[in-house]
Amino acid sequence: WIECGEGSALGAIEAAKEVGGYVTGYVGDMTENGPDVVLVNLIWDLEPMFTQMLKDTHAGTFDNPWYKYGVAEGAMLYTINENLADKIPAEAIAAAEKAFDDIKAGKFTVPFIPQAE
């Protein structure tokens, strides 16, 4: 499962334990919540964004801007649960690494798709 949000991630971890599946931790490293079921983690590192906000505030230039921080800015990372790494095909790991590298290098832009009404 891949879920969005810490609460739903914790629920997905419990469900994976019950049925023997695998899950993606979300927001932070959730491996300790399910060391036998959390395959990978998508981690938010918002320190770069908050640092920029503080700098802008200190400089008097903070004017309610929209800060876009993601993979390219180092604010979205992933980790692999080393105890379960053998469950992930090497080509899948290589593809994920390439995608992250391409985003960081500006070779691929993740499209923004607003929610449809």
Question: What are the roles of these predicted feature ranges?
Answer:
Residues W1-E117:
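A residue-level marker of the well-folded mature domains of exported/periplasmic proteins
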